[in-house]
Amino acid sequence: MAKIKIFALGGLNEIGKNMYVVDIDNNIFVFDAGLKYADDSMLGVDYIIPKYDYLIQNKKKIKGIFITHAHDEQMGALPDILPELENVPVYATKFTMEIIKRELAESKINYSKLIEVKPHVKINFGKISVFPINVTHSVPDSVGYVINTVDGAIFYTGNFMFDSSMLGPYKTDIGKLAYIGKQGVLCLLSESMYADKKGFTAPNNRIAPIVNEILDQDDRIIVSVFPNQFYKIQELFNGIMHTDRNVVIIGKRLQDIILNSIELNYMKFDVNKIKTISHVNDKNIIVLIADDREKPFSNFLRIIRGYDKFIKLNKKDTVLFMSPVFPGMEKSSSKLLDGVARIGCNLIDLSSKYLSHHASSEDLMLMINLLNPKYYMPVNGEYRHEIANKKAAIIAGMNEENILCKLNGDVVYFKNGKLVDDDIKIPTDELLIDGEVGDVGEIVLKDREMLSDNGVVVVVITIDKLTKKLKHQIEIHSRGFVYVRDNIDVMKEAVNIATKVVNDNTKPNFIDYNKVKLGVRDELGKYFYNEIGTKPMILLIVQEI
């Protein structure tokens, strides 16, 4: 009999940032380590990851981090967390591991504990074992993980859907799922992102019919994609192979992933059809445009604004928008679509018309029927998605009291195979990551918001080194605050206020710099707010000459 704790450090009540912990008698198993894309209001923040203090504090108990598939939301936090977890092993299938290695190399991280797993090959940890099972998702080699315990199995689905037409590295092993169900499942952790959508996701995930129509058109075709949309890119390539069109790829990450996938035989395409940037203006060319994970749409927005030196959009172009729009990215995607429309291109937006490879309500119910779990825990979705997942589970025959809708940090505790009503909470938070400086923090983010909204005022104070009196008139410069020529009187009065503060805190051969700095910021802040209605960030440069 075992003591089992299940909780999320990220991934509940949100899209992305997936990180789920299963603690079995102090043996810790971590499933996924993902990021979440920053929303448009998070100035200078590239992405967000779960705060992983719990993992650092318990790293000696961690048996491994198990990654379900090669999407940023599942593996994007690894470059940030692994350096502090030392020799914790990372387990993933072949294709997923190739992408992990690429991301770590890009971040200049040399990590030796990377262990490739094969679907349906058990990984033993004493009395506990982990068993990967193939599932269908938009990237090859996607898996869910079964954790076998003495009290029954725990199954984490990762992202999945059911589609009998999928083959090879995209195929779900339904037989293995049914077998696991017959052995007894204590708890099923199942994704929620499309739980509010009726029916099965298939065939609404396939874009081949519309792609083939688009390829029949004349002139150049520009396609906006995310690097992780492997199956949709493959559908596009399948269509291109039946035409005389060639491809130019813009975005180093996308180019590397596509070429690596072709080399490993995970993507089928004639590499001779991939041309250099010099062909970007050919009439029959297909231009694939993607970005690094930190700056979604940045390459395309640069092109729309006319800043790209290689490619200019024109009215003859067809623009195919395939990129998914994650929560918080609506403003950027709207700018992109509006920009294309203003140029007059033929715009085709597939982002909301075709589903991604996530489980809709019928997919969720089929998974429940195959596994017949005692308890059910909706994961990977905003709270409304978790509730929709709960409703699907009830329709599938689950008892409502056995459906566990939780928030990050809420612990589901099983003792000897029974749910214990114990109000345990693990502290959780998130880290805001700037690719250049690491964790940004709330204070820095607020400063950036203030700069964006109210501008900055720089006050330059020059003090005589000997007398400690003002050597020159105080200078005040502003950016993003007011147009100086239209507010000369305001700026003159600001100089007078700052001068008075300096003089009030100066004695013969002595000046109280702390009072000067605090006083100037305080008095100018009040003055600007009363006169202009905004309070800019006020920076002081105090120098002695």
Language model features: what each stretch is:
Residues 59, 84, 182, 313, ...:
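Alpha-helix termination/capping residues and helix-transition junctions
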Residues 196-322, 326-372, 377-489, 497-510, ...:
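Hard-cation-handling environments
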Residues 1-66, 71-279, 299-308, 331:
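His/Asp/Glu-rich metal-coordinating catalytic cores
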Residues 104, 393, 528:
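Conserved hydrophobic residues forming the short capping helix/wall of the S-adenosyl-L-methionine
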Residues 118, 407, 534-538:
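Short Gly/Ser/Thr- and Asp/Glu-enriched loop/turn motifs at secondary-structure junctions
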Residues 144, 458-460, 540:
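Beta-strand secondary-structure signal
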Residues 116, 288, 539-543:
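Extended hydrophobic secondary-structure segments that form protein cores and membrane-embedded regions
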